[in-house]
Amino acid sequence: MTDTGTLFLNQQDVIDAGAADVDWVGAVLEQVFKLHEEQAFTAPPSSFLKRPECPHVADRIIGLSAHVGAPFDREGMKWIASSHINPEHGLPRANAVIILNDPVHRLPIAIMEGALISAMRTAVVQALAARYLARPDSESVGLVGAGRIGALTLWAISKWFPDIQHYRAFDQNAGRLQAFVEHMGTLDITVEPVPCFQDALSEADMGIVATTESEPYVTASEFKRGALFMNVSLMDPTFELVSAADKIVVDDWHQSVHSDRVLARMHREGLVTRDSIHGEFGAVVSGHIPGREDPDERIFWNPFGLAIEDIAVASAVYDQALSKGLGKTLRLVDQEWDVLF
């Protein structure tokens, strides 16, 4: 292999390559979950940089690396940083960079803006989960957390569930909630702002939490019969809510219980085991276990978020960028350093 350089893709390049297309990203992610079920990937535990003087659960940097098998056959890392105070300063809560390497020579073939890929795969995974786990006749969606992930998630769901009648949202910041409602209106999604999280979730066929809360507060009273509860964020649901579920579905069992999120805490206390959950989502997508079987069952969906999702989407973006002539080629090395000695 000849070193052809490293393709640099900024956010607009990533968008132009297809990463903002819900259907395109969804097709990639469906493949990813089938590969996960086949164990056609390698993904070590995430690396967390967490400083003791910054105790908030959202204040950290995470390195997620993975190799994803064919048809992608690429490896790489997402380096994603987050600060819970950023929105107060007009900055995005999270930012990310993704590096792709070829799987044989390990040369860096691409460096790309990763926040959009990270946000889109997070949102589209929820829409994909809804396809398999929500009632097909769902009419209402409730959201807690009027941020970018929440907006993208509602947008993705609206693409695949056009018959949704009611969207309700709550956020502790009234100004942010109003801005969220106005923004969603520009996307032809009418969102009703509500005064408390209970009003957003208690009657929702799909309940979504996408916040940076560090303590649980959502109870089983906000998890109605027949609902799908999507635990997109960190610590919002109580043990009681999780225990009320008829089925618990995770993206990856090992990752889910080796964290500090609600399911991991329940596992450490012996309240949730591998045998007590319904299974991993890849098994559902592959048809090895059923998704929703009963219109009245309550399903708790716990997506940890997987590096293979990021690397697969980034790999597909890279291929599209090459075919469309997007980005700029960088030369990281003009000559090997050892020629200097």
Where are the model-predicted features located?
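N-terminal ligand-binding/catalytic initiation module
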Residues: 1-119, 127, 137, 279, ...
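Adenosine-phosphate binding glycine-rich loop
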Residues: 13-19, 242-340
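Short helix-loop-beta connector
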Residues: 133-140, 163, 224-225
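Glycine-rich Rossmann-fold phosphate-binding loop(s) that bind the pyrophosphate
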Residues: 146-147
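N-terminal Rossmann-fold NAD(P) dinucleotide-binding loop
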Residues: 150-151
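Aromatic pocket-lining residues of Rossmann-like dinucleotide-binding sites
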Residues: 157
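NAD(P)-binding Rossmann-fold cofactor-contacting core
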Residues: 160-185
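Rossmann-like adenosine-cofactor binding region
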Residues: 187-271
